[in-house]
Amino acid sequence: MSKIAKTAIISPKAEINKGVEIGEFCVIGDGVKLDEGVKLHNNVTLQGHTFIGKNTEIFPFAVLGTQPQDLKYKGEYSELIIGEDNLIREFCMINPGTEGGIKKTLIGDKNLLMAYVHVAHDCVIGSHCILANGVTLAGHIEIGDYVNIGGLTAIHQFVRIAKGCMIAGKSALGKDVPPYCTVEGNRAFIRGLNRHRMRQLLESKDIDFIHVLYKRLFRPVPSLRESAKLELEEHANNPFVKEICSFILESSRGVAYKSSEYSSEEKQEE
């Protein structure tokens, strides 16, 4: 049975499943759908075509599904889809998609979005990610699974961050980050590998292989793209080569890499 505060304002067109808790002074619009076990603390606002998955918990003064902050948006149909078991903390803002993007913003399962996180239109966030306080994502950003982003970090539109990456706090990131890398700075560049996350997800032999692979990729000569092509040709059946090198070759913004930065950090870790 759902538990709904008397002061909540809920559209009769909204869909509320069983076991949902809605706190005082929440506002829920026409196109909102809340799956089983969703919990809204007081003063949460949900608008637009917004779907919230099972057991997701949203804290006070979060605003989800309101009109994108994009001057090109003209009221077209778009969605915000959030998966299961997410924690969305105080004052987060998450916008739906736009006609100029994929028409939806997507967030996976088991993520933690800390206070004051902003997720702009057409972003795609995987599962098991942590976005610390004050992280700001511009539009059209793609984030893979198991990514950690430190507080007060700003990320440029259309940037892609692959699986298992770590973005240090107070960074400004304008380029793509391939799998399992750590980046830091303004502008942020790759400093080394996210070995903590790799040890959680991979076997030791695979970590060693990826370490050597990045050493080959990040040599001064040939270029990063040429190195990625060569690796794919020579190790086409290796899943890590395919994952990492394909990501590099598909990058439209370029990779956040400087040879001097990566080399110095890796030497410290070794």
Swiss-Prot record:
Q: Source organism's superkingdom? A: Bacteria
Q: Name one GO biological process term.
A: lipid A biosynthetic process
- Report the EC code(s) recorded for this entry: 2.3.1.129
Keyword annotations for this protein? Acyltransferase, Cytoplasm, Lipid A biosynthesis, Lipid biosynthesis, Lipid metabolism, Repeat, Transferase
Catalytic activity from the UniProt record = a (3R)-hydroxyacyl-[ACP] + UDP-N-acetyl-alpha-D-glucosamine = a UDP-3-O-[(3R)-3-hydroxyacyl]-N-acetyl-alpha-D-glucosamine + holo-[ACP]
Q: Report what the protein is called.
A: Acyl-[acyl-carrier-protein]--UDP-N-acetylglucosamine O-acyltransferase
Q: How does it assemble?
A: Homotrimer.
Describe its function: Involved in the biosynthesis of lipid A, a phosphorylated glycolipid that anchors the lipopolysaccharide to the outer membrane of the cell.
The metabolic or biological pathway listed in the UniProt record of this protein is: Glycolipid biosynthesis; lipid IV(A) biosynthesis; lipid IV(A) from (3R)-3-hydroxytetradecanoyl-[acyl-carrier-protein] and UDP-N-acetyl-alpha-D-glucosamine: step 1/6
- What is stated as this protein's family in its record? Belongs to the transferase hexapeptide repeat family. LpxA subfamily.
Q: State its location(s).
A: Cytoplasm
**UniProt organism field:** Helicobacter pylori (strain HPAG1)
The entry lists its GO molecular-function terms as: acyl-[acyl-carrier-protein]-UDP-N-acetylglucosamine O-acyltransferase activity
Q: Which cysteines are joined by disulfide bonds?
A: none
Annotated Gene Ontology cellular components are:
cytoplasm; membrane
Question: Cross-referenced PROSITE patterns, in alphabetical order?
Answer: HEXAPEP_TRANSFERASES
Q: Does the keyword Flavoprotein apply?
A: no
The record's InterPro entries line, in alphabetical order, gives:
Acetyltransf_C, Acetyltransf_C_sf, Hexapep, Lipid_A_LpxA, Trimer_LpxA-like_sf
